[in-house]
Amino acid sequence: MDFSFSEEQIAFRETARQFSEKALAPFAAEWDAESLFPKDAIREAGALGFCSLYCDEEHGGMGLSRLDAALIFEQLSQGCTSTAAFITIHNMATWMLTRFGSDAIRARWAADLMSGEKLASYCLTEPGAGSDAASLSTTAKKDGDDYVLNGAKAFISGAGDTDVLVLMARTGGPGAGGISCFAVPADTRGISYGRNEAKMGWKSQPTRAVILEDARISADCLIGEGGQGFRIAMAGLDGGRINIASCSLGAAQAALRQAQQYVQERKQFGQAIGDFQTVQFTLADMATELVAAQQMVRLAAWKLDQNHSDKSMLCAMAKRLATDLCFNVCNQALQLHGGYGYISEYPLERYVRDTRVHQILEGTNEIMRVIIARNVLKDLSFL
């Protein structure tokens, strides 16, 4: 078993690190403080291929593996976790559109989405349908050559500032089989957006409700076939869980580096606090948990690349483990800074705020446990 990276992976990771240090990290605190959505930086990321990492080359994407993408997102998140997380969502939505969409849909959207000139939102969650996503009530009713959309989506990243909504709506009966997926132009008449939500973290990306009132779209906006929407949405989420776990890894690495430096500089009782065994034990646990989370994420990404039968379970495991452990690493790094960790002069409080939501979105960590447990009860052959 070889855990080393290829020369290509090392090069991609280094490019991402340099971009993160130059284009994200110096501005992350400002974007957070002023709730600025850095579209220019995202376009710069697109110019490097970071907006189409695992989209097929035949459709204009980079054609990288999910493991490659995980390594890149990990580096981007060290510069600005919130912005990196949006880039992962854009990648997921763009992949869904290009992987399952028609030639006409790809011709309309693919090039601009992959370059970062236009941006995509993923629209699944509703006010009354969160963890129970298959119960969504937004409808898409066929009317001649069109579909007419009615309903509402909640907590949509980028909504109001993006160009296309990859949106799940009910075209048939109840349950998952009645859901279809659409590429909806964001400026369609009948679509309006709620206020930009005031959030604990992820302040560099807007989060709004999407309200659909007799929003009419052409039937050729349908992604895949009718009734396939839930399957398409879940296919996107397997990768999305790896992506968000990778963002947690990046934030935790940044927090650990900050803590490592601080405990060697900060003196109390006549010596650096890093000389105290309790601090050393804390750092040891942080590093151990971070490495364990890294390996879990990379295993799950590899399983997804191999289309292994237990890929969805492994993605759920990786998301649950990495987002929990990495939040703890960020929180411990803040604790090691004492009062300084709590003020915005240092980035620790931002790392904590930005990683907290990772335990909620792309499926709550409680739902991840449900997915894992279902598989465990069926078969333990994955061990």
Q: Residue locations for each model-derived region?
A:
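Alpha-helical interface subdomain recognition
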Residues: 1-84, 88, 100-105, 112, ...
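Structural signature of FAD isoalloxazine-binding scaffolds in flavoprotein oxidoreductases
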Residues: 63-72, 132-136, 185, 211, ...
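Short glycine/proline-enriched turns and hinge-like loops at secondary-structure junctions
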Residues: 64-65, 132-134, 158-162, 176-178, ...
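Short Gly/Pro-enriched turn/cap motifs at secondary-structure boundaries
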Residues: 86, 128-131, 155-158, 170-173, ...
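A short, Trp-centered hydrophobic/proline-enriched beta-strand micro-motif
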Residues: 116-124
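Flexible, small-/acidic-enriched active-site or ligand-binding loops
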Residues: 135, 187-218
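A short core secondary-structure module
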Residues: 146, 150-193
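A short, charged helix-loop
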Residues: 211-233
